[in-house]
Structures are given as structure tokens and as C-alpha cells.
Amino acid sequence: MESSLRIVAITNCPAGIAHTYMVAEALEQKARSLGHTIKVETQGSSGVENRLSSEEIAAADYVILATGRGLSGDDRARFAGKKVYEIAISQALKNIDQIFSELPTNSQLFAADSGVKLGKQEVQSGSVMSHLMAGVSAALPFVIGGGILVALANMLVQFGLPYTDMSKGAPSFTWVVESIGYLGFTFMIPIMGAYIASSIADKPAFAPAFLVCYLANDKALLGTQSGAGFLGAVVLGLAIGYFVFWFRKVRLGKALQPLLGSMLIPFVTLLVFGVLTYYVIGPVMSDLMGGLLHFLNTIPPSMKFAAAFLVGAMLAFDMGGPINKTAWFFCFSLLEKHIYDWYAIVGVVALMPPVAAGLATFIAPKLFTRQEKEAASSAIVVGATVATEPAIPYALAAPLPMITANTLAGGITGVLVIAFGIKRLAPGLGIFDPLIGLMSPVGSFYLVLAIGLALNISFIIVLKGLWLRRKAKAAQQELVHEH
């Protein structure tokens, strides 16, 4: 590769908390070590930071897009005519060297209307999962803000403040705060569906998807026992997104073309999907959601524990990867229906791999390298706020023992969370969630967390010790054979 390249990059992930900034830092460090100049735009939970200007993009030799929730059409249009290397953000951290070595051969030339591949790269830039994660990322602030308000109202009631609703006269302050909080959960579903659709087809899909998903989730309007919930958001968001994506390709002539996006697409899409949702999609999705809720509420304990083990194991298995995200999405989506115990598994298990790895370096330092020991304190602090990604470097160094230890401990801890009846109202601050009212009971949370960490650390020490001894023995035998 030629020396002193000018590179620009964008990083984003569904939560916008850990991967976004860790990958940005890794890209910057690697570029500097190779003598390149780089600027990375981060699209995290705090919004867009270090935004790339059109001049910087124009001057760049290559563009790196490490994304977990996709990019809007407007964002992608910024790179028309540029050589672009795309990679899933969950893969970027472990393949930093590969990214830079493959820039000349595996980049894509973005045309104004479509991407034309130059190299061998096979990247699904618009995968269904990336669209779903765009919806989840947009819904997070609604749930976080709403969940904290609901928790605050509950805490105020526990401190003795009155709780009266409108049916008993003037509502109390605690009722008002709680009601505002529940609005976050109410709008979580239409926002999720709207951003799924707009991730596929940009702004013209946003309004129809928002309104139709709101309709699908309103059981009073539909006359059903349950709203469509996250199932409706996923199905309708994807359907409307792809419908509008196709609709935008219609050519009406110069005089009428400007009306397509502003008038025809919203009108036709809302009419078609609004009617379909009222008579068909809404009732069907509502029945499915009602069946799922009934199953979760009446599931036998043995089966519930088995499911909890599976969810916990999935959350700990690939630390922010697709398996983790699938389990996380399932648990998160149930919050809107006020089912909080499954999301409590996320609140405990997600922080265990990095914290356990960090603590294990202090307990058994001989099992870890100097770099791993130096990163231990950071892994503990960052991991304690439910950012699982700091565990990735430890897993890359010793995949079999670390992933096995995390998965076993995660599964067992998932069972304990359900057994102790722990609930989590919304995403928060990890280990501090009980202190701000987001997780309860407080004592059960810290007890289960302590047990889970003890198991995780024990598994790491035993399994990695065996793995290192076996590795050393194999190396010694190979040395003997050579002589």
C-alpha cells in the first residue's frame, strides 16, 4: 500500500456507547502507526461527533465505514465517487490490521446512484439486521428516559408521597411523572418501526411507518386484546421501508417528480398500509403478540429456567456480536409490554465478561499478558456500566477458554436472575441501576451479580489454565519432533 494515505471513517453501533468509540480509537492508532492521516466521525449515543466535512471527504484516498446500525441514504451519498471499505463494527475491532491491508483491493467505488464493486469485498451494507438495529438505536432514548421517570415515581411513592390518578380528582405529582415516563414506552414501538423503515428508504418512509406502527400498537383503535408490539414494528417497518424503496424508483416526469417524495409516497403508503394494518396485519400481529405474552406469563418454571439459561448464554457468547444482539433485542422489545424480568438478565449478564476478565488478571496474573493486565482496570470500570466489548481482546487472545467460561457463567446467571425475580425497567448504568431505581430487588441484584462473577472468574482461571498448559505441552512436543 502506498504510504501516507488520507483516510476518513465513520463508526456507529446500535447502542452507540462502546463499539463506536473503541473502533474509532483503534482505527486512529493503527493509521498513525502506518504513517497515514485519519479522521473518524463517531455516530454515538451523544450524537455525531468529529463530523467529516465535504472538503475532508473529497481529499480522502479511502473511506472506512464500520457500522452496526447502517447509514442513511443521505450519509451514504456523501461518499459518492469515493473508494469505500465497509465492515460490520462487531468485526472491525478484531480485524484492524486486515482493514488497512485490504484497502487497495477490497474497497468499493460509490457511484451517485449505487455502489460499484472494485475488489473482492462482499459486504451486506443494507442487511435486515442493520435496519433493525437502526430502529433499536432510535428507540433507546425513549425507553431510557421513560424508564428512569417510572423508577423515580416509584421511589417517590416509597418515600411516602401520595399516588392518585385522574379518576380520583386532581392527579398527584408521582402519577404525572409516571405517566410521562410511560409515554416513552408507548412511543418506543412507532419510533422503532419508523427508523427501521427510514434506514431502508430514507425520510419518505419515516412518517407513514410511524403512524402505521402507532395504529398497530393501539389496542383500543384496533379493538384487540393486545397491541402488535415489537413484532408489528419489525414487520411493518421492514414492509413499509422496502415498499417506499421501490416506490421512489417510479418516474413521473419533471413536472410531477418533486411531488413523489413529499405527497404521493406518504399518501399512498399510509393509505395502503393503514388499511391493511387495521383489517389484517394489526389483528394478526396483535394475536401473535398476545400469544407470546401469554406464553411468557404462563411458561412452566423448568422451561422458563431453560430459556433463561439460553438467553444468558447468548448474551455472553459473542460480546456484542449477532448472537448477543438477537438475545438483547428479544429482551429489550418486551419492555414495552411491561415485562421486565428478561431484560434484567441483560442488566446482569452483559457486564460480567469484561468485569470477570479484569478481576481474573488480578487473581491469577500468570495467566495473562502484560497488555491484558494493563487493560484490566479499564475493562472493569467500562464493563460495570454494561458495555460488554472490553472483554473482546481477552477472548481474542484465548478464544476457547474465555468464550466457554463467559457462556457457562452467563447461562447460569440468567437462571439465577429469573429465580430471584429480578426486574429491570430500562437501560441504565449497569452496576448502579438499583441505586437509581431501575433494577429491583436491590439485594438480589448484587447477590446474583456476585455469584455470577465468582463463577465466571473461576471458569476463566480453570479453563484458561488448562488451555495454556495444553498449549505449552503441544509447543514442547513440536520442539522435540523438530530435533
Swiss-Prot record:
It comes from Escherichia coli (strain K12). This is Fructose-like PTS system EIIBC component. It is found in: Cell inner membrane. It is a multi-pass membrane protein. GO terms for biological process: fructose import across plasma membrane; phosphoenolpyruvate-dependent sugar phosphotransferase system. The chain crosses the membrane at residues 132-152, 180-200, 204-224, 227-247, 264-284, 303-323, 344-364, 380-400, 402-422, 442-462. The modification Phosphocysteine is found at residue 13. One of its GO terms (cellular component) is transmembrane transporter complex. Residues 1-105 form the PTS EIIB type-2 domain. The active site is at 13 (phosphocysteine intermediate). It catalyses: D-fructose(out) + N(pros)-phospho-L-histidyl-[protein] = D-fructose 1-phosphate(in) + L-histidyl-[protein].
